[in-house]
Amino acid sequence: MAHSPYNEMYLEKGAGRAHYQRYAQWLGEQPADRLAQKRAEADALFHRVGITFAVYGQEEGSERLIPFDIVPRVLPREEWIRLETGLKQRVRALNAFIHDIYHEQQILKAGVIPAEQVLCNSQYRPEMQGVDVPGGIYAHIAGIDIVRDGAGEFKVLEDNLRVPSGVSYMLENRKMMMRLFPELFSAHRIAPVDHYPDVLLDNLRSVAPTGVADPTVVLLTAGAHNSAYFEHAFLAQQMGIELVEGQDLFVRDEAVFMRTTQGPQRIDVIYRRIDDDFLDPLVFRPDSMLGVPGLLTAYRAGHITIANAIGTGVADDKSIYPYVPEMIRFYLGQSPIIGNVDTWMLRNPDDRDYVLAHLPELVVKEVHGAGGYGMLIGPAASGPEIEKFRQQIIAAPERYIAQPTLALSTCPTFAEAGLAPRHIDLRPFVLSGREVTIVPGGLTRVALREGSLVVNSSQGGGTKDTWVLET
């Protein structure tokens, strides 16, 4: 049975949902000109702070402000507790999976996942076979994309385990809302998020190599041209650690050092924000100018921790995603608390035949795609676009998965004509160290174009503050 989109704030007859009622009443009492003035103030402040991201291939300029909407997404405490429990379960299983495939490969031997889908995956790193990492933790930082379907059920849409981004916008959105509307934070008990950098740093320090009492942590960036450079600089500053580029580091005697004006300083943990391919030109891409020659040697020797671990990307590949519920059963002996979105694997002939016959109804994604690129949304696509994807699927079916076109939940959002429903998702950030921790809420992304289901900032999406109510 098809469902219309679930409205996060309002019931079908227009009354506010219980957890939104106080906010909905406040919103209805606000003069339109005050809200317009606050929206303009938010834009001006974000411009001043420089909260931008780079857009590649855009002639009009590379820097763009991520639009911020002043209507928050609100989650009641009981919903958040269930989400939090399910997210922790999922990330524990994903870490167990990554450890397993680089060691005993029990899940492959049991036939739960076809071995070739893992071992022939471009994100599988044979160099990591047999490498033990502190605590058996590979995905120290995970951004899990959650959607709510028309029936009101939460589903995991995507696991982001390589270099998940967006947490700086979560933190800045909260600061902005507290500045613009302090009265709302007096009227609601909203779980704080500003301790995220402290929790992240504590987790990174907790996974330092064995025997290091006072670890030195750095954040490795590709540089100012990177699309998420604002976030790199922001997090380094918030954690009080050095922001470094590959040229700032070197390896000597299987240890990693940072060049400083006082001489070389030993480094224990690297929070890397660059992909595996660029980390070590002696092992991966030889033309990389972003990494550190010899880094993998130091890593394999156990003298440096890299977060997230090299080779983690195999677990966030979209061709592996359909198997995560089975990972939870296999490694934890539990049923998944948060389900997956139904997914067709186009490498399977029956799935491929079905999808090719129903392309105008489905969403098709490249298994290595990200940022909303390399995707077909059938109901919104033209005939030529659908035909182009059809030919691409026939030529290389293993490169694609397909999913139903979900009626993503909506939240009132300011549009040109006033408040209107817009589709949203949620990216909570899951931190793994001594324990698995989630700062309440996450980054709510919103598709600003009417009817659009694409929330990615690179595709014109915006963001909202996410409130988790404590009572």
At which residue positions do the language-model features occur?
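Preference for protein termini
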Residues: 1-471
